[in-house]
Amino acid sequence: MNRQEKAQIIEQLKEKAERASIAIVTDFKGLGVEEFTQLRANLRNVGVDCQVVKNTLARLAFTGTDHEVLADKFKENCAIVIGYDDPVAAAKAVADFAKESKTFDMRFASLEGKYLDEDGVKALSKLPSKEELLGKALGTMNAVPTNFVSLLANVPRGFLNVLTALKDQKEAA
């Protein structure tokens, strides 16, 4: 690989790191080609990139980005998983694959510039997704006016029931 190719890889990875909300560093030693292809497909389905890069190139690419906390931690063979929109979806996809595979491990991550160890990534993977949280918030916000309108409707309804009962009572008499 010549200097120009290395510079291009660094530039591409730096651009991805600048857009990323999460970067997870994984150990893929012992992972077969089929398994790694399956991992990439799983990650692609949730809008996440996975890239294997030399440690020195990764160090240079992550320096000067929000995920700079990872720059000095690249050692041994590693694959970098980069998530853009939903960090929980990226963490879930990686954690699920790590459960299935005996040779694939999460090492550490950077979530919007904050360092997370392996336990932190696992904890993040157990949180509800962005869509689920938005749905719960919307449901909660919608419940307040609905309950208020129902409460307001009960007053005239109760009054109408009393009038109907009085009418029935007078008709019976």
Swiss-Prot record:
One of its GO terms (molecular function) is large ribosomal subunit rRNA binding. One of its GO terms (cellular component) is ribonucleoprotein complex. Transmembrane segments: none annotated. One of its GO terms (biological process) is translation. Keywords: Ribonucleoprotein, Ribosomal protein, RNA-binding, rRNA-binding. It comes from the Bacteria. Part of the ribosomal stalk of the 50S ribosomal subunit. The N-terminus interacts with L11 and the large rRNA to form the base of the stalk. The C-terminus forms an elongated spine to which L12 dimers bind in a sequential fashion forming a multimeric L10(L12)X complex. Forms part of the ribosomal stalk, playing a central role in the interaction of the ribosome with GTP-bound translation factors. Belongs to the universal ribosomal protein uL10 family. This is Large ribosomal subunit protein uL10. It comes from Maridesulfovibrio salexigens (strain ATCC 14822 / DSM 2638 / NCIMB 8403 / VKM B-1763).
